[in-house]
Every structure is written in C-alpha cells, then in structure tokens.
Amino acid sequence: MKFIGAVYLLFLLPALSFNSSYEGLEKKLKEVFTERTGILRHLSKTSKELDSIKGNLQSLKNEDAVPKKDVQRILELSHKQRDEMKSLQAALQKQLDDAAERAEKQQATIKFLKMEMEKKTKIIKDLQQENKSLKNKLLSGNKLCDIHAEESKKIQAQLKELRYGKKDLIFKGQQLMDLENKLKVAKDELEKAALDKESQLKALKDTVHICFSSVLHSQTASLHRFPATPTNLLRYSALVNNSRVTFQQPHMKDIPKVPRITTTSKLPVSSAVMRRESTGPKDCQMVKVGSDCSHNQTESSSVMKKTFGHSQSKTPEQNGQGQARTAEESVKTDGELKKTQSDKHN
C-alpha cells in the first residue's frame, strides 16, 4: 500500500502548480528521492525474501518433504510476483524519469528565473542610480532655476531702470529740442540785432561824413573870404588832416551779441546829428576869424572821435544804453561848443 501511495504521489506531481516557491519544489523533490530510495530498499528486501524462498524450495526438493504441486504453485506465484515487480519497476522508472525531466526543467526555469532576477536586480540598481542622478539633476536644476529667477528679477529691475532712464532721456531730449529752438530764436534775434547795429553804424558814418563835408564846404567858403596866409593854410591843412576819420567795417565775430535794441534809441542819435549838422556851419558863418572856427571844428571833431571810440569800446551789454548816452552827450557837447563860441565872440 505504501508503494501504491508513492506511485499516486508521483502521478500527482504534474498537477502541482508552478506558482509555488522554489524552496517548496526542492523539498518535494527531496521527498520523491527519499520515497524512491525506500521503494528500492523494499524491492531489495523482497528479492532477498524470494532468494530465501528459492533456497527453501530447493531444501524442500532435497528433503522431498514438500509435494511438487505446492512447489509449482509457489514458483508460479513467484513468477507472477516477479512480473508484477518488473512492471512496477518499469512504471517507477518511467515516473522517476519524468520526475527527473521535470526537475531538470524546473531547475532550468529556476536558473532562468535567477538570471532574470539578477538582470532585474541590475536593472533596479541602474534605475536607482538613474533616480539618484535625476534627483541630483533636479536639485541642480532647482538651484539653476533659483539662480535664473534671481537673474530674471535683476534683469527686470534693470529693465525698469532702463525704462525710467529712457523716459528721462526722452524728457531731456525734449528739453534739448526746446533749448535748440530757443537758441535758434535767440540766434535769429542776435542776427537781427547785429543787422540793426550795422545799420546804426552806417547811419553814424553817413552823419559824420555829412558833418565833415558841411564843415569842409564852410571852410572853403571862408578861404575865399580871407587871404591865404601861410599860418591859415597850415591851420586848414591840419583841420583837413584831422577831419578825416577812418572807419573799419566790423567783422561778424567782433559784433557783440546783445538783445534786440528798440528803434527809440535811433531817434536821439539822428536828431543829435542833425543838430550838429545845423549848428556847425552856422557857428562857422557867425565867427569872423577863420582860425577860431577851425579851432572850434577841430575840437568838435576830437570830441566826436572820443565819443565814437568810447561807444565802440564798450561792452556788448552796455551798447544798447551807450547809444542813448551818446545822444545825450552829443547834445551836451553841442551846447558846450555854442557856449565857447559865444564867449569868444564876447
């Protein structure tokens, strides 16, 4: 019965699930091998018993105590038992071979699974290392992100400063444009003032030339009246030489840059010059002696030179006021000349 149970167990081995653990399979294989060894021991015992039976039969034959029929039956039983034992041995060998093949297959699968497990462990280790490297990269990336965020904040602050600076530059540019426009307007006004100054200088030149031409005409008339003595000729030649006043055309650089002068300052100058023109020849006609007239005219020409030179040597800021003063001074000089001439007549 034990032998039959072992056979059933061997037949039930293929039905075992492959999902069992490797240790369970190894234990089962060990149990199968132990049962196989037990069966082999049992067979050896039975073979020994058969040998003992043969010995007994031979002893019985020898003794002739046992009948032949019993011996034949015993022999037949022994043959049957041998055949059964051979069939059982063949079945057991087949089962053992199948079990060995299955065990080999299971061992191969176990080895394959071990290899796969090793591969998977290697893959897991590689993945862990990759995870560590990725974590390090993430940490470094976070640090870089923080650095980039700080840099972006700095750049945004710089951009804001640049925008404010741009606005300031635009405002300053507008101020510069306004200043340029103001400078252009002031330049135009200065050019106009320079033109007015040139016109005033030309008018003064014309008036001075008219004055001296009238004086010369009056002196030529007095020469026809009085005899030409050498002393008088010397005086008249000195008067002619002194009456020639040279004027240089002013350059644009020498013209002072002053604000525009109103036209009211021109009127006293022209009136003073006209008075001078009107008083000069009359005084000369009223005086009897030519020397006194020439002396008075030389004094008037020297005063004109001083006043004209004084007006040219003034600063650009005082030129506007200087013209009005020259007009007043010319009136005063005319009054002084009249007084001196009246005193001489008296």
UniProtKB/Swiss-Prot annotation:
Main location: secreted
Chain residue ranges for the region called Leucine-zipper: 162-190
Signal peptide: 1-17
InterPro entries to which the protein is assigned, alphabetical: Luzp2
Positions bearing carbohydrate: N19, N131, N241, N296
Polar residues bias locations: 293-324
Protein name per its UniProtKB record: Leucine zipper protein 2
Any one GO cellular component localisation term in the record: extracellular region
Coiled-coil region: 41-209
Disordered: annotated span: 271-346
Keywords carried by this UniProt record: Coiled coil, Glycoprotein, Secreted, Signal
Subcellular location: Secreted
Encoding gene (name): luzp2
